[in-house]
Regions:
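Rossmann-like dinucleotide-binding domain that binds NAD(P)(H)
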Residues: 75, 185-253, 302-309
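Beta-loop-alpha module in the N-terminal Rossmann-like domain of NAD(P)-dependent dehydrogenases
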Residues: 78, 89-149
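C-terminal substrate-binding/catalytic lobe of Rossmann-fold NAD(P)-dependent oxidoreductases
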Residues: 225-288
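N-terminal secretory signal peptides and thylakoid transit peptides that target proteins
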Residues: 1-15
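Conserved acidic residues
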Residues: 72, 105, 185
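N-terminal Rossmann-like dinucleotide-binding module
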Residues: 15-20, 24-88, 165, 179
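C-terminal helical cap and adjacent loop that interface with cofactors, partners, or active-site loops
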Residues: 267, 271-352
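A contiguous active-site-proximal alpha/beta segment in oxidoreductase catalytic domains
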Residues: 138-201
Length: 352
């Protein structure tokens, strides 16, 4: 583990050095930067119906794109869906998953169904140095995630693996705010969801509380159609704190709520359910542009890895341990999170 951590840390330094040596623009001439051409992956259970509306010049935001990041090429296993998307948003359809090489500046996978095959879909782009956005939960197992992270490090290819909640102001300011409340006693949170993959709160709270989660538990009646859901992150004792639990549940009506209870006060955050798509998703797209324009990592590779280990452990708890806490280190690296839609690909798509 320490060797892998050092490898990933070195990769981050390499990317940072590359940016420093090849700065594409200063703040003063940022407006002169050409819009990045974005390759579109996945149009079924996908963010792209929302993202395109914000990014395309044909979107609803005053008839213009909101960022210098525009969808220009699209691939989907369903050719009709790809052509319908292209007609609506002014894109070019490619006939193979690797057909956007040499045509786009970045690729963004918006499709949940793609996740177990994401390491295959994105491999050509990672090897070619094309920045890639990974769809959550980022992989089906740790072995496949490590394949992508290793390629990112080897080829100095920026990757980003986040959920919208990680880009909200509460996530950005929370770590500083909790420094003023003394030793943490307990953490509670809720999020309005219909299925487990949309339960983004754990990643937001890890950004606030830290990534040194030791054990995870998950209880739910159904990951596909949630009636009840509870996920617990167990933080061990450390030099400057007592052990505590971050307990998160599915609940309405707010998009999310959380409270961190300390010895000397509390820190809370919330987003109302009425928040529109701009409020919910613009931060993600802005940070994608900011990171990929500069060819930097939004988060260190070992943070991406730890986030996946936490969700993998949550599923392992639910399906192998009846919801009991599971030490992250005890989950086999090749233990798979089941595909959202089994047999979404038959394998023929990945052969020349």
């Amino acid at each position: 583990m320490s060797n892998r951590r050092e490898f990933f840390r070195g990769a981050g330094a390499t990317l940072a050095a590359a940016w420093a040596a090849n700065s594409i623009a200063s703040e003063a001439d940022a407006a002169a930067i050409e819009p990045m051409k974005a390759g579109v992956f996945g149009l079924d259970y996908s963010f792209w119906s929302i993202w395109a509306d914000l990014l395309s010049p044909k979107g609803r935001r005053l008839g213009t794109s909101t960022l210098r990041l525009t969808p220009t090429h699209v691939w989907d296993k369903d050719s009709k869906k790809a052509h319908d998307f292209a007609a609506r948003w002014g894109c070019e359809v490619v006939d193979r998953y690797d057909g956007m090489l040499g045509k786009v500046d970045v690729v963004l996978n918006g499709e949940l169904n793609n996740v177990p095959w994401q390491h295959l879909l994105l491999r050509p782009y990672l090897e070619a140095g094309v920045p890639c956005f990974l769809q959550r939960p980022w992989s089906d197992n740790l072995v496949h995630l490590d394949e992508m992270l290793d390629l990112s490090a080897k080829h100095s290819t920026p990757v980003m693996a986040t959920v919208p909640f990680e880009h909200y102001s509460d996530a950005d300011t929370g770590a500083a705010r909790i420094k003023n409340i003394g030793e943490i006693q307990a953490v509670f949170g809720t999020a309005q969801i219909s299925d487990e993959p949309h339960f983004h709160l754990p990643y937001m709270l890890m950004k606030i509380l830290g990534y040194d989660v030791e054990s995870v538990s998950m209880s739910t009646d159904d990951v596909h159609k949630v009636g009840y859901l509870n996920v617990n992150h167990f933080y061990p004792r450390a030099a400057d704190r007592r052990p505590f639990v971050s307990s998160m549940s599915a609940a309405r009506p707010d998009a999310y709520t959380f409270t961190v209870m300390g010895e000397h006060g509390t820190v809370s955050g919330a987003m109302p359910a009425q928040a529109d798509n701009f409020a919910r998703f613009f931060g993600t797209l802005l940070d994608i542009q900011r990171s990929f324009e500069k060819r930097t990592l939004y988060q260190p590779l070992d943070v991406i890895r730890k986030k996946f280990q936490c969700v993998q452990a949550a599923y392992y708890s639910r399906f192998e341990r009846a919801g009991a806490p599971v030490k992250i280190a005890a989950v086999p690296a090749d233990w798979p999170i089941a595909a959202w839609t089994p047999n979404w690909y038959d394998g023929s798509e990945f052969h020349k």
